[in-house]
Amino acid sequence: MSHEVGTELPALSVRLKRDDLVRYAGASLDFNPIHWNEKTAKEVGLPDVIAHGMLTMAVASRIVAEWIGDPGAIVEYGCRFGRPVVVPNDEEGALVEVTAKVTKDFEDGTVKVNINAAFDGKSVLTGAFARVRVS
């Protein structure tokens, strides 16, 4: 596994469906109805039910964890939520496409990986990055 600056990580595609949102709500104790109730989501101006921001963030971090082989090697992770992932109530759900690239090599044995997560061709996370221990 190369961790040189410029290395592109293998792309990751994750499909989120409504049942994933319900399971995540139970695990996170975030039962905000915008994540499961269409009527509520639309009443607050959303186009439909949306994925939890933290679920989207977790999905995006998988690209780094799978690349490095040890989720514990991620020593820092951050992002801002740029736009929602709308999850329709159908068999297809929402497809989140994740790409990442090593952008900096630090002297302490870590590298910075910039991450992009996109839904419907548009980024959903802003400034997403992970600092990863590689040695």
PLM regions with names:
Residues 47, 56-102:
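Hydrophobic beta-strand-centered segment that forms part of the acyl-chain substrate-binding groove
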Residues 50-56, 119-123:
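Noncatalytic linker/hinge segments flanking ATPase motor cores
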Residues 1-51:
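Catalytic strand-loop segment that frames the active site of acyl-thioester-processing enzymes
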Residues 14, 84, 107:
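Residues that form or immediately flank small-molecule/cofactor binding pockets and catalytic motifs
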Residues 51, 73, 107-109:
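Short loop/turn segments at connectors of secondary-structure elements within structured domains
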